[in-house]
Amino acid sequence: MKTLLKNRELSAFFAIVALFVVLVALNPAYFILQTLAMIFASSQILCLLALGATLVMLTRNIDVSVGSTVGLCAIAVGVALNYGYGLATAIAFALAIGALAGAFNGLLVVGLRIPAIVATLGTLGLYRGVMLLWTGGKWIEGLPDSLKSLSEPAFIGVSPLGWLVLALLLAGGWLLSRTAFGRDFYAVGDNLAAARQLGVAVNRTRMLAFTLNGMLAACAGIVFAAQIGFVPNQTGSGLEMKAIAACVLGGISLLGGTGTLLGAFLGAFFLTQIDTVLVLFRLPAWWNDFIAGLVLLGVLVLDGRLRQALARHQRALKYSRFQPGNKGSKQVARFPERKSKEVA
């Protein structure tokens, strides 16, 4: 129990394995590598958003505008390609749009000191409005095969975009755990005042978190356009809540300073796995959000109970050392008794 609480990635991993076992038990035909590859392909958008949300949440902030950023950047890459620009130029354009959107969120939170939830709720509507004004409410269609080919299975059934997601996960995980740059994110979220005293560039770190989050949302928009082949005017709606839920499932604390990119990745994979299982068993689509929310609540309640039990256990161990008769207790020498003088 103690190991699971300290390594929340294990909890998410065991949940993924358990759900896969249930899936195979109900239908052994799904016990193939292709099933995992299909779930991973479906999870790539949410995985990218969860990675970006982790950076922001580590600094004790939150961004609920990433769904609109995904739609805006998917529109950007689609418009650029339809205007005849090359694939590399269109991708760079979308990444720049995402970085600007994230940096603007950071400016509102860091520069103007607007609470993150309020600022990003505002930009949620703003970016969605810009997207609709840009396209006139129309869909972007006729995307070239050069973009679609990026989402087609390649080496061991994983697409080039899938390998990009894994590369970002590995690189980001290494940066956060092995470099001073990554440790700054944890320091800012864990104790803001202490981070300032230690010389951490707090404002720069928070700005970077929002900017990188915007760029990862842009990557998600590019993946969406490549996988679907067109861009509807409601692209990205509701994804911000799923990204936050994936982070919480993976052990990212809403209070900042705790969690890993691997945990967020596994949380996103698990939520997508639930959707995929429902599709494979032909259950109505409206069950997806209900079951995902139910699972999230169940995990949070179980996690809270386990943490309380662990805290009680640790307190009991702490105070048991001072119980008389314990081998580990410290023996306190008694004062010698004074002999009373008899008065004649």
From Swiss-Prot:
Sorted alphabetically, the keyword list is:
Cell inner membrane, Cell membrane, Membrane, Transmembrane, Transmembrane helix, Transport
Residue ranges of region Disordered? 323-344
One of this protein's Pfam families, by short name? Answer: BPD_transp_2
| Basic and acidic residues bias spans | 335-344
List membrane-spanning regions. Answer: 13-33, 38-58, 69-89, 90-110, 114-134, 155-175, 212-232, 251-271, 283-303
Q: Which gene encodes it?
A: lsrC
- GO cellular component terms given for this protein: plasma membrane
Tell me a Gene Ontology molecular-function term this record carries. Answer: transmembrane transporter activity
Query: Has UniProt tagged this entry with the keyword Cell cycle?
Result: no
What is this protein called in UniProt?
Autoinducer 2 import system permease protein LsrC
Matching entries from CDD domains are given as: TM_PBP1_transp_AraH_like
Annotated function: Part of the ABC transporter complex LsrABCD involved in autoinducer 2 (AI-2) import. Probably responsible for the translocation of the substrate across the membrane.
Q: Which family does it belong to?
A: Belongs to the binding-protein-dependent transport system permease family. AraH/RbsC subfamily.
- Quaternary state and interactors: The complex is composed of two ATP-binding proteins (LsrA), two transmembrane proteins (LsrC and LsrD) and a solute-binding protein (LsrB).
Q: Is Transport among the key words of this record?
A: yes
Q: How does it sit in the membrane?
A: Multi-pass membrane protein
So which residues are the signal peptide here? Answer: none
Which coarse location class applies to the principal site listed for this UniProt protein? Answer: membrane
Q: Where in the cell is it found?
A: Cell inner membrane
